[in-house]
Design a protein with these regions (language model features):
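Catalytic-core regions of glycoside hydrolase
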Residues: 105-112, 116, 120-249
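Short, acidic/polar
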Residues: 3-22, 225-233
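Short, well-ordered coil/turn segments that N-cap beta-strands
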Residues: 25-27, 61-65, 99-104, 142-146, ...
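Aromatic-lined substrate-binding rim segments of carbohydrate-active enzymes
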Residues: 13-72, 82-85
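An active-site-proximal structural segment forming one wall of the substrate-binding cleft
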Residues: 46-64, 79-107, 127-140
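Catalytic cores of secreted or luminal carbohydrate-active enzymes
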Residues: 226-279
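Solvent-exposed loop/turn segments at secondary-structure junctions
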Residues: 34-38, 71-76, 110-114, 152-156
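Extracellular/luminal regions of secreted and cell-surface proteins that mediate adhesion/ECM remodeling
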Residues: 262-426
Length: 426
């Protein structure tokens, strides 16, 4: 994750700048908006247009963004009154909703120094006001999107609950199920500069809660806790998905020197590897195609936003493509898990005969992103990714022949022809 605007690091967002970030194999850019000049009133039309334009550029670049809004860049610098914050969230709601598909996650922001929910000059650093602001933000986003809060303690105060999200309530759209964590003093000292009231309890909570909610943030400075063994352990235990690539550079230099930086980069968030697969290799139309795929997640975390899973048939003679969506939610492919995906899909009677190559596709479920390769998940295996389609090769072939099916398929899942529209290059 690369920051682009917060703390005046970059004055304006450009497509060329985003392309440079993307060339580093980073797919999420952090957009931080300092609203200091709007502490006493509505956001201007120009500010709203700027935010909307930034989202447009992120979309054009084929990336997603993490967003945060705030007023203060130091302790003692003013934030805004509650009424102003709620009014501005209401102003932002149409823009956030219209661009939710390219928002990876939102940080709660607004309150206090750096939008980190402490040192509020308007007395907003209390559970009641935090609740009003967080609930307004959750309402401003669709239920498919989540918000990161600065510490577990703040979440517990807002919801009057200290137990983590359970597997049964994960992704159910409730406010609690949509709240994750960001730690902007990761590995700084024994309690990450006050991130944890009780570090043991906080870590135990996040280790379970952030199996189903996002965890991210940044390091502060080099400390004994940044030692690679501990860093990798905590990144894995707490299920980190996003890490500010710009801060702190000294920590990254240490990790590079000690040989663990590449592992951190590879394992942030999910990282799916294909282990094996078995598939029918010759079928008549009207038959059922049987598949069995085994994958593992070697990343620190799982997916926290919705994602489709498809098997693709691509005819080798003319590249016609047919897709079938699988009845599975990959957000439950947890770190360390080995996952077996198996089932049967019908071969339509009108499917042309010929040889087909098999692919696994994990596209964004939102229609406007679904066919864009940049928004499909690339498996970690070498040589399986097709950057022009976003498909992952299963290294298997299926021969379709005309004639009666050996056994007629009676299920509902079938392959359907993909539209002729070519996927975007981004």
């Amino acid at each position: 994750m690369t920051p682009s605007k917060y703390k005046d690091e970059v004055d304006s967002l450009t497509l060329a700048g985003l392309d440079k970030i993307k060339a580093k194999d980073q797919s999420v850019v952090a957009l931080g908006y300092n609203l200091a000049k709007f502490r006493h009133g509505k956001l201007s039309k120009a500010e709203l247009e700027l935010i909307n334009h930034d989202f447009k550029l992120v979309r054009e670049a084929g990336m997603k963004c993490l967003i945060r809004f705030g007023y203060s860049e130091s302790i003692g610098e003013p934030d805004a009154p509650l009424s102003i914050i709620l009014e501005q969230i209401a102003q932002l709601k149409p823009i956030l909703r219209a661009n939710a598909d390219i928002i990876a996650v939102m940080q709660a922001g607004f309150i206090g120094a750096w939008g980190e929910w402490h040192s509020s000059t308007n007395g907003l650093d209390n559970a009641a006001d935090r609740r009003k602001i967080l609930f307004a933000e959750l309402n401003a986003l669709p239920k498919s999107r989540m918000i990161m809060v600065r510490t577990p303690y703040y979440v517990w105060g807002i919801f009057d609950r200290t137990t983590p999200i359970t597997r049964t309530e994960a992704f159910n759209g409730s406010n609690y199920s949509r709240v994750g964590q960001h730690n902007d003093c990761f590995l700084a000292n024994w309690n990450d500069y006050g991130t944890y009231v009780d570090t043991t309890v906080g870590h135990e909570y996040i280790a379970k809660d952030c199996l189903y909610a996002p965890m991210g943030g940044e390091t502060c400075h080099v400390s004994k806790y940044c030692e690679p063994g501990n860093a990798l352990y905590q990144l894995a235990r707490l299920h980190w998905s996003l890490l500010n690539s710009a801060w702190n550079p000294e920590v990254y230099k240490l990790w590079e020197k000690e040989g663990c930086l590449n592992q951190v980069k590879k394992r942030l968030g999910y990282r799916f590897e294909l282990l094996s697969g078995t598939y029918d290799d010759s079928l008549g139309v009207g038959s059922g195609f049987h598949y069995s795929i085994r994958l593992t997640n070697v990343g620190f975390a799982a997916l926290f936003n919705p994602r489709d899973v498809q098997i693709i048939l691509q005819r080798n003679s003319d590249s016609d493509r047919y897709a079938a969506s699988l009845p599975i939610d990959p957000r439950f492919w947890e770190p360390g898990d080995t996952v077996d995906v198996a089932g049967e899909i019908g071969i339509p009677l009108n499917l042309p005969a010929g040889e087909y190559s098999l692919y696994l596709n994990l596209p964004d479920p939102v229609p406007q992103l679904h066919s864009r390769p940049s928004y499909s998940i690339r498996l970690a295996n070498i040589g399986v990714w097709n950057s022009s389609t976003g498909f992952n090769s299963l290294d298997a072939r299926l021969q379709i022949v005309r004639g009666p099916a050996a056994a007629a398929y009676k299920g509902k899942a079938t392959f359907r022809r993909l539209t002729a529209e070519s996927p975007s290059s981004r």
